[in-house]
Each structure stands twice: as structure tokens, then as C-alpha cells.
């Protein structure tokens, strides 16, 4: 039984596995490899020269992609009083406090991002074991613990994505959909790369961006030349 289907093999045949592609060339190619019968997500994986065993070399943050993500995002906000009203006015999908905590404890998780005002974190902390492993716990580093709930909601709805290093020092994040034109994907790719360059830990030694791979949901990986990518982002 073949490991991959015919569509994947046809897409993989377009990619030179030994080549480091120019960023724009890689984006044009990844669109050609997206052959599934749905609008595939385009994702980038950066292998960074960081030692995540040290807390000061763990990278976590968020960036607003100028071209958006192409995804409808459901935002939940933990807030009370005036801040709850602000959240509702800004377009939050769910707003509440103890009621939402109880609902989540019962197994409800129909949202993509959670935001909380700082005064709500003692309450939200009860959900650590549920939200933490799913990457849904509000965090000041990603701008999801804030009193400026309206701005947080607007940024998330506009295309804010979170990123963090995993145990292997890899950051993987989406930069849009296969239906996006190359220029829109390029703007998002650049924004994400710039954010990671700004987040470089002072203690990181040697080459920072060791490898960069771009792929569609069901497609093969395409290696991007890190030096060309860094030079493009720093212009």
C-alpha cells in the first residue's frame, strides 16, 4: 500500500528536495502543490538555533498578518462590567466570567482564542489543565491578557497568529490559504519572519534561522533559503 496518494506524489514531483528555494519561488510553488479539494492552509516551519532547555531562549509571541489568515476566528473573552460591554461591542463571539468557566469545565470548547482582563486571571487559572495543553490559555506574551480587550479582539479578527518554539526549537505557524495570491502570502511570510527576527534571544549562539520549510496542509515540504529570507525581511 503506497504511503502517499497520487495527488501528493504528483505535487512532490514538482519539488526539488535538494534545493533551497528563493522565498517568492517557494510561495509560487507551494500554491501549485495545494491540490486537495479544500482551501489548504499554507504553513511555515522555522528551525531556530536556540536551546529551549533555557527559559531565556524559549520564544513566544504573536504577530498580526497584514493579509489576514483566511480563517473565521471565534474569540472568547473573560471579562465583567464595562470591559464585558467593550468586548461585546468589539465583536467578541462569547463574553462572560464564572458562567464560561463552568461551561468549559463541562467540556465546551467551541472557540479558537481566549482573551482575559488581568483581574479575571485568578478565575481563569482554574482552567489551566484544560486550556493549557490546547494552547488556549490567555497569556500576556501574546497580548491575550489585557484591559484593552477591544484592540485585542480587533487584532485577532484581523489575522493575529501566535507562535512559540516547541521542544525541538521549531516554530510552526500559518501564513494564509492556498487561495491567497502570492503577494498576499509574501506579505504575511515577511511579517512572521520579521517578528521572529525581533524575538531572537540575546543568548542564542550561531546561525539563528537554521532551516525554513513551507508547505500546504496536504502537500510536501519546500525548503526556503534562510539567508535569502532573512535578507528580504531585513530590507
Swiss-Prot record:
Q: Which GO terms describe its biological process?
A: regulation of translation; translation
Q: Which UniProt keywords apply?
A: Repressor, Ribonucleoprotein, Ribosomal protein, RNA-binding, rRNA-binding, Translation regulation, tRNA-binding
In terms of SUPFAM superfamilies, this protein maps to: Ribosomal protein L1
Show the coiled coil region(s).
none
GO CC annotation terms, alphabetical: large ribosomal subunit
PROSITE patterns, sorted? RIBOSOMAL_L1 (PS01199)
Q: Which GO terms describe its molecular function?
A: rRNA binding; structural constituent of ribosome; tRNA binding
User: Does the record carry Transferase as a key word?
Assistant: no
- Which InterPro entries is this protein grouped with? Ribosom_uL1_bac-type, Ribosomal_uL1, Ribosomal_uL1-like, Ribosomal_uL1/biogenesis, Ribosomal_uL1_3-a/b-sand, Ribosomal_uL1_CS
**Which family does the record claim for this protein?**
Belongs to the universal ribosomal protein uL1 family.
Summary of the function given for this chain in its UniProt record: Binds directly to 23S rRNA. The L1 stalk is quite mobile in the ribosome, and is involved in E site tRNA release. Protein L1 is also a translational repressor protein, it controls the translation of the L11 operon by binding to its mRNA.
User: PANTHER family, from UniProt?
Assistant: 54S RIBOSOMAL PROTEIN L1, MITOCHONDRIAL, LARGE RIBOSOMAL SUBUNIT PROTEIN UL1M
Subunit-structure text: Part of the 50S ribosomal subunit.
UniProt-listed HAMAP family: Ribosomal_uL1_B
Q: What is this protein called?
A: Large ribosomal subunit protein uL1
Highest lineage ranks of the organism?
Bacteria, Bacillati, Bacillota, Clostridia, Eubacteriales
Amino acid at each position: 500500500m503506497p504511503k502517499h496518494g497520487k495527488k501528493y506524489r504528483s505535487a512532490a514531483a514538482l519539488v526539488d528536495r535538494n534545493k533551497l528555494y528563493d522565498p517568492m519561488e517557494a510561495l509560487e510553488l507551494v500554491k501549485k502543490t495545494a491540490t486537495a479539494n479544500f482551501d489548504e492552509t499554507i504553513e511555515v516551519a522555522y528551525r531556530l538555533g536556540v536551546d529551549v532547555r533555557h527559559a531565556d531562549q524559549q520564544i513566544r509571541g504573536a504577530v498580526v498578518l497584514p493579509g489576514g489568515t483566511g480563517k473565521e476566528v471565534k474569540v472568547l473573552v473573560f471579562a465583567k462590567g464595562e470591559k464585558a460591554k467593550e468586548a461585546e461591542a468589539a465583536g467578541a463571539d462569547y463574553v462572560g466570567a464564572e458562567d464560561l468557566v463552568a461551561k468549559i469545565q463541562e467540556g465546551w470548547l467551541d472557540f479558537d482564542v481566549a482573551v482575559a482582563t488581568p483581574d479575571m486571571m485568578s478565575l481563569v487559572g482554574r482552567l489551566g489543565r484544560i486550556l493549557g495543553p490546547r494552547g488556549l490559555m490567555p497569556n500576556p506574551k501574546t497580548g491575550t491578557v489585557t484591559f484593552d480587550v477591544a484592540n485585542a479582539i480587533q487584532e485577532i479578527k484581523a489575522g493575529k497568529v501566535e507562535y512559540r518554539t516547541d521542544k525541538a526549537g521549531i516554530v510552526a505557524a500559518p501564513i494564509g490559504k492556498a487561495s491567497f495570491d502570492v503577494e498576499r502570502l509574501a506579505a504575511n511570510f515577511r511579517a512572521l519572519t520579521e517578528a521572529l527576527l525581533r524575538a531572537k534571544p540575546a543568548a542564542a549562539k550561531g546561525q539563528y534561522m537554521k532551516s525554513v520549510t513551507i508547505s500546504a496542509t496536504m502537500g510536501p515540504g519546500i525548503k526556503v533559503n534562510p539567508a535569502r529570507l532573512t535578507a528580504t525581511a531585513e530590507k
